[in-house]
Amino acid sequence: MLYHLLYPLAGDVKLFNIFKYLTFRTIYAMITALLVCFVLGPWVIRVLEGLQARQVIRTDGPESHLQKQGTPTMGGVMILAAIVIPTLLWADLSNQYIWTVLFITIGYGLIGFVDDYKKVVEKNPKGLSPRQKMFWQVLLAGAVGTFLFLKPGFNAQLFVPFFKNFHPDLWFWYIPFVTLVIVGASNAVNLTDGLDGLAIGPVAINAATYMLFSYVAGHATLSAYLQVPRVAGAGELAVLCGAMVGAGLGFLWYNSYPAEVFMGDVGSLSLGGTLGAIAVITKQEILLVIVGGIFVIEALSVIFQVGSYKYRGKRIFRMAPIHHHFELKGVAEPKIIVRFWIITIILALVAISTLKMR
């Protein structure tokens, strides 16, 4: 919005010429997102407390979690506001990729909101059924996959890090592949959101990593030099990624141990889906497995646990997702959280290193 209002006036007011710089708008999207969280945070927490939107803690989980009983949840609405508002203010709103990602951000946020509202406000413990949630997730992700597949100039090739000449064309299978990436990322983040700050920290790190890759993908010279897939217009997603980083840090202000508020499904489903959509548009889907390694490990721990119990009658972990396994082994919650953040930072550095490893 500010870009469209002020940049056209740059001929008369030279100061407004700064709005053409992507780096400037990305930095201020990040700062704006932080401010949105700081301004809205206390109010959102009070409203959630007034609605009795409080987290219900499982009695079969770690005993230390019982003290979290009654903590407000659905704080993801704050995150959504802190992503959407700065993006609308600082991004070039004529860019189709911005609206494509916001479609997933808001759409998945609505799915999570309805599920949370039914569970914690209407006191319906089932919320949306898994089948209902999956239906809407697949529908929205499939719509994005179809849009990209039919978009002129956007190819259906899969780019694999470390292999500069290996670009298999997925053709029609690109649509289910996009669906898998977005839905998988969404649910992986959702499974990770089990400790104070455990999910939002890696999400912010992932967003910062994709902020860099979005900028490179949209830059003709840099993408050619680094042999990164060139996606004209994808650079604008750096602004949205910047907003995600700011929103993540702002929410962490309230969600760090001991948490004053939880993000709920409205936050986790939306954030994961957003990362998946950005990965797809920047042609860095495989990279998400690297930088989002913590999310992958958390999801796989659940899959292996369920599969092992179903077919062998035995559990691999004391409890899944794997962060609960470490809790039951006596590792303190803050230590698990910080260690997972450290691992994510290392994985992000590995992901960034692929820019020079072709």
From Swiss-Prot:
Provide GO CC annotations from the record.
plasma membrane
Q: GO biological process annotations for this chain's record?
A: cell division; cell wall organization; peptidoglycan biosynthetic process; regulation of cell shape
| One matching Pfam family | Glycos_transf_4
User: Looking at its record, which EC class is this enzyme?
Assistant: transferase
Which reaction equation describes what this protein catalyses?
UDP-N-acetyl-alpha-D-muramoyl-L-alanyl-gamma-D-glutamyl-meso-2,6-diaminopimeloyl-D-alanyl-D-alanine + di-trans,octa-cis-undecaprenyl phosphate = di-trans,octa-cis-undecaprenyl diphospho-N-acetyl-alpha-D-muramoyl-L-alanyl-D-glutamyl-meso-2,6-diaminopimeloyl-D-alanyl-D-alanine + UMP
Q: Has the keyword Zinc-finger been applied to this entry? A: no
Q: Which InterPro entries match?
A: Glycosyl_transferase_4, PNAcMuramoyl-5peptid_Trfase, PNAcMuramoyl-5peptid_Trfase_CS
Which N-terminal residues, if any, form the signal peptide? none
| Pathways per UniProt | Cell wall biogenesis; peptidoglycan biosynthesis
What is the official name of this protein in its record? Phospho-N-acetylmuramoyl-pentapeptide-transferase
Q: Lineage in the entry?
A: Bacteria, Pseudomonadati, Thermodesulfobacteriota, Desulfuromonadia, Desulfuromonadales
The gene that this protein is the product of is mraY
